[in-house]
Swiss-Prot record:
EC class name: lyase
Xref: Pfam families: Pterin_4a (PF01329)
Chemical reaction(s) catalysed: (4aS,6R)-4a-hydroxy-L-erythro-5,6,7,8-tetrahydrobiopterin = (6R)-L-erythro-6,7-dihydrobiopterin + H2O
Entry similarity comment: Belongs to the pterin-4-alpha-carbinolamine dehydratase family.
Record's keyword annotation contains Amino-acid biosynthesis: no
Superkingdom of origin organism: Bacteria
Name under which the protein is recorded: Putative pterin-4-alpha-carbinolamine dehydratase
Organism from which the protein derives: Acidobacterium capsulatum (strain ATCC 51196 / DSM 11244 / BCRC 80197 / JCM 7670 / NBRC 15755 / NCIMB 13165 / 161)
Cited InterPro entries: PCD_sf, Pterin_deHydtase
Length: 92
């Protein structure tokens, strides 16, 4: 899969306002009421990621979850990253 152009990245990000470009990846931070709620969300993300065959970097700090997406094989952001980000947003 080909890397997206800067213009395409900007366009895709406009439909995902909670996601931010932190080159070379996009990231989203979500806060929950507690650790259990954060872990429940992470487990749902894991299911989506497995179905997509594309896996985010996930950092869990008590009730705070940071997700980061980049397509390592392509050396940057691709449609796969934005498709999975949209899938993750649907969980919230």
């Amino acid at each position: 899969m080909a890397q997206l152009t800067p213009k395409a990245i900007e366009e895709r990000l406009s439909s995902l306002p909670a996601w931010k470009l932190q080159a070379p990846e996009i990231e989203r931070v979500v806060e929950f009421s507690d650790f259990v709620a954060a872990m429940a969300f992470v487990n749902k993300v894991a299911e989506k990621a497995e179905l997509a065959g594309h896996h985010p970097d996930i950092d869990i700090r008590y009730n705070r979850v940071r997700l980061a997406l980049v397509t390592h094989d392509a050396g940057g952001l691709t449609e796969r990253d934005f498709d999975l980000a949209a899938s993750i947003e649907a969980l919230l």
